[in-house]
Each structure stands twice: as structure tokens, then as C-alpha cells.
């Protein structure tokens, strides 16, 4: 039995509340169990210098955790004067995952920045940020279409992500912190709406695992992402 009482193939309770902030072109509060992430999408009619004049847009991401999003307070990275390697890795992952789901040429010469702020962390913050990031991005693009700034929809696919792992020898879906901290193996899967893979991050923490173990995690992730896709569709309908 999992610490949460869930079955091995069961997601945590998932909710997506859109329009959570007033000013951003797209926003949502996404919750997987006790993990809660506020995601906003902000439109800027400018591009990084290396992209100017190339006839395409850009989607980038920033990620951060509130000081008391975890069991004990952590100093803000701004107070430390630099971002951690973990933060940089996660925000790059979010950005490239979301770029896989959009035609940057159809976006035009503008940038959409996805800001992911972890309000409460209980495992799976990066995957929640990606899944919520797509919702915020979709909402921002909808505004561009409604205003006539875009005449063609640049979104080519939904994007969602979920964690899986091997806990006490059993492959499980959507690890919370209690499971993640003791898992023999863990993985993050990012998928397109048709279940094609965008990214896989997998590592053995306690013991190596074989190819069949990885495939079992992949099958769980595909099942979980299908449920997330359904919730995303409801949120942006």
C-alpha cells in the first residue's frame, strides 16, 4: 500500500483553476495533491536579440519556490545572489517542453514567458509546472487569437508531464514527496497529446532496473498523461 493509500496507477487529486491572476494573459493554479503551483503566461512584443528578424517567436520559462513551500524555510535565491543548478535545469526543461507543442513561426515575433511559482511542494513540482504551463500558454494564445493579433493558431499539441517511480519494488504513478524520497528509481515523462515523448528523465536511486522496468513506467506515464490531458481540455474549454 502506498503511503497515500492510492493504487499504483492512480494520480493524486488533480485540479486546475484558470484565471487565477488578473494581469497575466494566461494563468492557472494547478494542484496535484498537496503540490500547488501558480503558473502565468506573459506576452511580450519583443524577442531576445539572437532571434530578432528571424520571423519566429519564442516561449521561455522561469521557475521558483516560495521560501516556505517546503517543510522548513529556504532562503530566496534572489537573496543568495544566484539561481541554483536545480532551478536552471527545471526552467530549461519547462521551456523546451512547451516549445515542442507550439509552432514558433506561427507565433510571430513575440515572446511568451511562463512563470512557475511553487506555493507548496509535495513532489512533482516540475511536472506540475509543465502541465500547468501548457494551460497558461493556451489561454494566452487564445487572447492573441481573439484580439486578431494572430490569425492562425500556433498551438500544435497539448503537452503534459508526470512522474513515475519504483517504490518497494512496485512501479507507481505520480510520486509524492514521501515516495520520491525513498524510491528505488524515479522518472519524469513529458508527452505530446498523441503520447509521443518530448523528454524522459530517469535514474536509479537505490538499485538499477531493467528495460522492462522502464517500459512499465512508460505505460504508467502514458496513462497518467491521458488523464492530465482531459483535465487540461476542461480547464481551457
Swiss-Prot record:
Q: Which Gene Ontology biological process is one annotated for this entry?
A: tRNA processing
Specify whether Nucleotidyltransferase is a keyword of the entry: yes
Where do the annotations place phosphate binding? Answer: 86, 124-126
Q: Which reaction does it catalyse?
A: tRNA(n+1) + phosphate = tRNA(n) + a ribonucleoside 5'-diphosphate
Listed PROSITE patterns: RIBONUCLEASE_PH
One GO molecular function term? tRNA binding
Keywords associated with the record: Nucleotidyltransferase, RNA-binding, rRNA processing, Transferase, tRNA processing, tRNA-binding
**Top-level taxon of origin:** Bacteria
Q: Does the keyword Transferase apply?
A: yes
* E.C. number(s) listed in UniProt: 2.7.7.56
* Assembly mode: Homohexameric ring arranged as a trimer of dimers.
Cross-referenced NCBIfam families: RNasePH
Function of the molecule: Phosphorolytic 3'-5' exoribonuclease that plays an important role in tRNA 3'-end maturation. Removes nucleotide residues following the 3'-CCA terminus of tRNAs; can also add nucleotides to the ends of RNA molecules by using nucleoside diphosphates as substrates, but this may not be physiologically important. Probably plays a role in initiation of 16S rRNA degradation (leading to ribosome degradation) during starvation.
The record's similarity note reads: Belongs to the RNase PH family.
What is the recorded name of this protein?
A: Ribonuclease PH
Organism per entry: Zymomonas mobilis subsp. mobilis (strain ATCC 31821 / ZM4 / CP4)
Q: Which gene encodes it?
A: rph
Amino acid at each position: 500500500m502506498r503511503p497515500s493509500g492510492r493504487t499504483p496507477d492512480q494520480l493524486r487529486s488533480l485540479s486546475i483553476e484558470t484565471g487565477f491572476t488578473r494581469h497575466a494573459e494566461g494563468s492557472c493554479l494547478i494542484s496535484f495533491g498537496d503540490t500547488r503551483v501558480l503558473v502565468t503566461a506573459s506576452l511580450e512584443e519583443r524577442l531576445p536579440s539572437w532571434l530578432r528578424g528571424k520571423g519566429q517567436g519564442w516561449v521561455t520559462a522561469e521557475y521558483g519556490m516560495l521560501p516556505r513551500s517546503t517543510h522548513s524555510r529556504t532562503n530566496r535565491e534572489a537573496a543568495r545572489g544566484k539561481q541554483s543548478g536545480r532551478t536552471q535545469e527545471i526552467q530549461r526543461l519547462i521551456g523546451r517542453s512547451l516549445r515542442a507543442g507550439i509552432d514558433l513561426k506561427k507565433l510571430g515575433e513575440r515572446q511568451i514567458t511562463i512563470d512557475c511559482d511553487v506555493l507548496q511542494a509535495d513532489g512533482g513540482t516540475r511536472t506540475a509546472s509543465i502541465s500547468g504551463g501548457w494551460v497558461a500558454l493556451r489561454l494566452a494564445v487564445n487572447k492573441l487569437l481573439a484580439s486578431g493579433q494572430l490569425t492562425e493558431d500556433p498551438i500544435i499539441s497539448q503537452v503534459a508531464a508526470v512522474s513515475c517511480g519504483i517504490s518497494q519494488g512496485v512501479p507507481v504513478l505520480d510520486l509524492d514527496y514521501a515516495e520520491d524520497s525513498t524510491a528505488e528509481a524515479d522518472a519524469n515523462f513529458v508527452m505530446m497529446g498523441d503520447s509521443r515523448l518530448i523528454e524522459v528523465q530517469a535514474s536509479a536511486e537505490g538499485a538499477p532496473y531493467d528495460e522492462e522496468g522502464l517500459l512499465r513506467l512508460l505505460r504508467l506515464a502514458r496513462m497518467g498523461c491521458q488523464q492530465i490531458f482531459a483535465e487540461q481540455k476542461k480547464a481551457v474549454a
